[in-house]
UniProtKB/Swiss-Prot annotation:
<dbReference type="InterPro" id="IPR013823">
    <property type="entry name" value="Ribosomal_bL12_C"/>
</dbReference>
<dbReference type="InterPro" id="IPR000206">
    <property type="entry name" value="Ribosomal_bL12"/>
</dbReference>
<comment type="function">
    <text>Forms part of the ribosomal stalk which helps the ribosome interact with GTP-bound translation factors. Is thus essential for accurate translation.</text>
</comment>
<keyword id="KW-0687">Ribonucleoprotein</keyword>
<dbReference type="InterPro" id="IPR036235">
    <property type="entry name" value="Ribosomal_bL12_oligo_N_sf"/>
</dbReference>
<comment type="similarity">
    <text>Belongs to the bacterial ribosomal protein bL12 family.</text>
</comment>
<dbReference type="InterPro" id="IPR014719">
    <property type="entry name" value="Ribosomal_bL12_C/ClpS-like"/>
</dbReference>
<comment type="subunit">
    <text>Homodimer. Part of the ribosomal stalk of the 50S ribosomal subunit. Forms a multimeric L10(L12)X complex, where L10 forms an elongated spine to which 2 to 4 L12 dimers bind in a sequential fashion. Binds GTP-bound translation factors.</text>
</comment>
<dbReference type="Pfam" id="PF00542">
    <property type="entry name" value="Ribosomal_L12"/>
</dbReference>
<dbReference type="Pfam" id="PF16320">
    <property type="entry name" value="Ribosomal_L12_N"/>
</dbReference>
<keyword id="KW-0689">Ribosomal protein</keyword>
<dbReference type="GO" id="GO:0003729">
    <property type="term" value="F:mRNA binding"/>
</dbReference>
<dbReference type="InterPro" id="IPR008932">
    <property type="entry name" value="Ribosomal_bL12_oligo"/>
</dbReference>
<dbReference type="GO" id="GO:0022625">
    <property type="term" value="C:cytosolic large ribosomal subunit"/>
</dbReference>
<protein>
    <recommendedName>
        <fullName>Large ribosomal subunit protein bL12</fullName>
    </recommendedName>
</protein>
<dbReference type="GO" id="GO:0006412">
    <property type="term" value="P:translation"/>
</dbReference>
<dbReference type="GO" id="GO:0003735">
    <property type="term" value="F:structural constituent of ribosome"/>
</dbReference>
Amino acid sequence: MAKLSHEELLSAFEEMTLLELSEFVKLFEEKFDVTAAAPAAVVAAAPAGGGGGEAAVEEEKDEFDVILESAGDKKIQVIKEVRGLTNLGLKDAKDLVDSAPKPVLEGVNKETAEKAKAALEGAGATVTLK
């Protein structure tokens, strides 16, 4: 197979639609057993309306810690999400999940914290923001 230059690859990507690129990324992840998870690619859930006074305090803060309280029933999925959020290796991510409650991310902005919380909760974890 002929080797493509970086310019040729970029040219090919420029001609693809977003759906085609998304499909390509999925195939690439499967082929090479990697993830291309970016914090911006995680869909955030709507914030909960409960806790009146506490919610007002959280909105004033500009840095948050994402605390993993427990992994729940889907420990493997939670480990995968932790790896995607932190770029930790498999062993380090597993150790973090096993030793919960532990901070997964520290000092991140509100949007990043909420996206991380939604991703971890989607994987079955119990998460708090501080």
